[in-house]
Design a protein with these regions (language model features):
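Charged, alpha-helix-forming regions
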Residues: 1-295
Length: 296
């Protein structure tokens, strides 16, 4: 059975959004969980249970998580799906290139499943872990539960592209930034109509069904040759998680409006905190104010 976890907003480095790879849906769910772990690490959130662990190593990190974390409301008899996904992912790599760098790296190694507990452990190579933590190229924000629902890896990748997108987005078919190379589909779906039917239409169908974000694709041509598509964002507001909407709304409100006057003034005038310092730590301060009597 799949693991039931509360929904959360995940911030994915644009390096991962634009990386070139060809993963199965199960392999992609391992990556989603890896990115979730990286976000917790970055936020300094301690994982307190024995089923989820991040342990630094000399050349990366060791991850522990339940096998159920990568399943989609399904049973996995004798861990067949999980074993296949971990084995396949350990033989694959990811490629990234921009105007300054190019790199290719293996992703994970030494996957292990404890059959009695259903706990998986694996090692993540350092460049992969650093890429998950690197937001210097920008990022995409998406809902983890929504991302885990998709059956098609193309739906997953288009969801990452379109999540939060408010303006039309041109995606070329060919070239180093093209969909064919980004999805590692060289030699497949050579006819444009086949590519659209097998990749874009499949992704759109799932996004239209499950996602708050979808798109309408307009074919773009140079002469008679199709060079790509402009994706016009479609937003289904009723599908967005209300709790995450509220979190986003609160995040925009300054600490001055959320902290009690005596708490805010005490921090500012007794400890000489600047307003931006209080804002950076407002989540912790608000929790303390709400939970601890006579907080200050």
């Amino acid at each position: 059975m799949s693991e039931n976890l509360p929904n959360k907003a995940v911030f994915q480095s644009y390096i991962w959004t634009c990386a070139k790879y060809d993963f199965s849906p199960y392999e992609k769910r391992i990556i989603y969980r890896l990115i979730e772990f990286a976000q917790r690490w970055l936020e300094g959130i301690k994982i307190k249970d024995h089923m989820h662990k991040i342990e630094p190593s000399d050349c990366g990190v060791n991850i522990t998580m339940p096998v159920a974390s990568i399943l989609r409301d399904e049973d996995d008899h004798n861990y067949a799906k999980a074993k296949a996904a971990f084995t396949s992912l350990s033989k694959k790599g990811a490629e990234y290139e921009d105007d300054k760098i190019w790199f290719y790296t293996a992703i994970i190694e030494h996957p292990k499943i404890e059959k009695g507990t259903g706990i998986a452990t694996f090692h993540v190579y350092d460049p992969i872990w650093r890429a998950a933590l690197d937001f210097t190229k920008g990022f995409k924000k998406y809902e983890l539960v929504t991302a885990m629902k998709f059956k098609s890896v193309y739906a997953m990748r288009f969801y990452e592209l379109m999540s939060g997108q408010t303006t039309p987005l041109f995606v070329p078919l060919e070239g180093s930034d093209g969909l064919r190379e980004r999805f590692n589909l060289q030699g497949k779906y050579e006819r444009v109509n086949d590519f659209r039917r097998k990749v874009i239409d499949v992704a759109k169908k799932e996004l239209d069904k499950f996602s708050p974000y979808s798109f309408v694709a307009k074919e773009e041509k140079e002469g008679k040759k199709v060079i790509g598509w402009t994706l016009f964002p479609v937003f289904f507001e009723d599908r967005e998680d209300p709790a995450l909407q509220e979190q986003a709304r609160i995040a925009k409100v300054t600490a001055r409006l959320q902290l009690e006057n005596n708490v805010y003034d005490y921090l500012k005038f007794s400890f000489d905190f600047k307003s931006d310092e209080i804002n950076k730590n407002k989540k912790t301060l608000i929790e303390g104010q709400n939970r601890i009597p006579d907080f200050m």
